[in-house]
Design a protein with these regions (language model features):
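RNase H-like DDE catalytic core and adjacent DNA/metal-binding regions
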Residues: 1-201
């Protein structure tokens, strides 16, 4: 059953109040990318069994942190922040932040290389998949079909590690969307946007 708006709002409130010192630290950062990736210090995605709920709660938490950080918007109450309807842009940002948070932990060596901080031989994953940053600094694969007319999300899927909760939620969501079709169909749909390493044991 899909989570209700009140359930999502309550979850967002709980995530915010459980780590007030971390919220304060993120609020005072000047780097928006630090604010976004730092969301992992405020939230634990293992609390969520539903991908949509994870993205919505993350969107509300990001909105709340931004409003705290922006001195001119501090007059807006926390209730207004959590009850105002989320936009497509909010959810797109939430999706990207969740993905980049997982990538930052799983692919630290690859990120260091892509940032130009390492001049040695590229890590195996960089060489194997032709990894690069997109405009949101999300890691994508160049793939073998990069010259086709397919959408970028299919030509250059986002790289995710196996055995991570976010990866599991993504596969589960695709499986449900495919009306519980077999593994092959589920993975085919997942790979329209994501490439999950060793997604079949």
């Amino acid at each position: 059953m899909a989570p209700t708006s009140s359930t999502v709002n309550e979850s967002a409130s709980l995530e915010l109040v459980k780590s007030p010192h971390i919220v304060h630290s993120l609020m005072n950062t000047e780097d928006r990318s630090t604010l976004n990736v730092g969301i992992a210090k405020v939230m634990d995605c293992y609390h969520f069994s539903n991908l949509n709920c994870l993205f919505r709660v993350t969107a509300y938490v990001l909105r709340f942190l931004r409003n705290l950080k922006n001195r001119e918007r501090r007059v807006q109450s926390s209730t207004e922040v959590l009850t105002k309807e989320l936009t497509a842009m909010d959810l797109t940002e939430s999706d990207a932040v969740c993905v980049k948070t997982v990538q930052a932990v799983a692919f630290a060596k690859e990120i260091q290389y892509l940032n130009g901080r390492q001049q040695s031989t590229p890590p195996a994953l960089v060489a194997q998949f032709g990894l690069f940053f997109d405009e949101r600094r999300t890691i994508r694969c160049k793939g073998r079909i990069s010259e086709t007319t397919l959408l970028q999300s299919t030509k250059n899927p986002i790289l995710l590690p196996s055995k991570r909760h976010l990866s599991d939620l993504l596969i589960r969501e695709r499986h449900q969307r495919m009306n519980h079709s077999g593994v092959r169909h589920t993975l085919a749909m997942t790979r329209e946007r994501f490439w999950i390493l060793r997604d079949v044991a």
